[in-house]
């Protein structure tokens, strides 16, 4: 089995796969203060839950947008396995044709999602990632990665609103019943859900206008955000939260020349 990690600023997705399928995914929170040993204990618990013996791990791959944690997780692999993991970045074959000014600026998470999406979906396409940031990756009809739209993520902007306003309360992450809120809580929930859905629809409209054609639109990222926000969008958007792990699987076997 191959152990894969997708490290975001907010959460870390842990997955296991082989040549046939993705066997499991789990999520833990990102904490810059945790030591390699603390993360190793957490990952060992995840493996135990999924009945995976660390001795079964024969390879590894990491995609990270938190460079400061890369060495930490290399040490985690050393603590749990005999594996030296791949790190998604320059020098690793991804299969993604990146056509932007400086490909080195492109986050690893965007690359792995694009690697999977180009194998599964028709181009042109927009890949929406709902995470710490909300991103729109664009691939043209020739499946060239031509650019990204980035803005603050749903939870990031919402937390900033509640922390920096004196009279707005902390509220639960619950769906609103209607757009026009009749209380502070309902109004804020409306903004979080309907506001972000409208923003997503608006960005899709502008991207398609700029390309001059309709796109396949896929959403990935945090499962609860995809499940709560995307249904309020008016565009047809496929939800595929396994996309990053599928991309890590694709890239791993592309670089080991064992993929079927």
What does each model-found stretch correspond to?
Residues 43-59, 203-215:
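Phosphate/pyrophosphate-binding loops at sites that engage ATP/ADP/AMP, CoA/4′-phosphopantetheine
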Residues 10, 133, 225:
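Conserved Rossmann-like nucleotide-cofactor binding loop
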Residues 2-45, 142-167:
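Short glycine-rich, Thr/Ser-proximal phosphate-binding strand/loop in the N-terminal lobe
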Residues 2-6, 61, 125-129, 218:
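Short glycine-aspartate micro-motif
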Residues 52-105, 142-147, 153-154, 183-193, ...:
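Short beta-strand-loop/turn "lid" adjacent to the catalytic site in phosphate-handling enzymes
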Residues 83-86, 92, 96-164, 194-203, ...:
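Phosphate-binding/catalytic loop of phosphoryl-transfer enzymes
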Residues 26, 176-216, 236-238:
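Adenine-nucleotide phosphate-binding core of ATP-dependent small-molecule kinases
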Residues 111, 166, 193, 234-260:
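Glycine-rich phosphate-binding/hydrolytic loop that grips phosphoryl groups
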């Amino acid at each position: 089995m191959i152990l894969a990690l997708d490290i975001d600023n907010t959460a870390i997705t842990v997955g296991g796969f082989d040549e046939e399928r993705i066997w499991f995914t789990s999520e833990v929170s990102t904490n810059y203060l945790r030591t390699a040993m603390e993360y190793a204990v957490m990952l060992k618990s995840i493996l135990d839950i999924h009945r995976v013996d660390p001795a079964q791990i024969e390879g590894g791959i990491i995609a990270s947008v938190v460079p400061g944690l890369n060495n930490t997780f290399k040490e985690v692999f050393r603590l749990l396995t005999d594996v030296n993991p791949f790190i998604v970045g320059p020098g690793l074959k991804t299969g993604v044709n990146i056509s932007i000014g400086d490909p080195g600026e492109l986050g690893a998470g965007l690359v792995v999602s694009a690697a999977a999406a180009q194998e599964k979906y028709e181009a042109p396409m927009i890949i929406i990632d709902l995470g710490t940031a909300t991103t729109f990756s664009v691939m043209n009809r020739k499946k060239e990665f031509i650019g990204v739209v980035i803005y603050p993520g749903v939870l990031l902007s919402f937390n900033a609103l509640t922390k920096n306003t004196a009279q707005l309360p902390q509220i639960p992450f619950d769906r609103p019943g209607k757009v026009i809120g009749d209380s502070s809580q309902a109004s804020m929930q409306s903004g979080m859900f309907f506001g972000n859905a409208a923003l997503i629809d608006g960005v899709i409209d502008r991207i398609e206008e700029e390309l001059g054609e309709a796109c396949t639109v896929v959403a990935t990222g945090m499962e609860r955000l995809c499940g709560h926000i995307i249904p309020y969008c008016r565009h047809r958007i496929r939800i595929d939260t396994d996309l990053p792990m599928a991309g890590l699987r694709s890239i791993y076997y592309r670089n080991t020349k064992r993929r079927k």
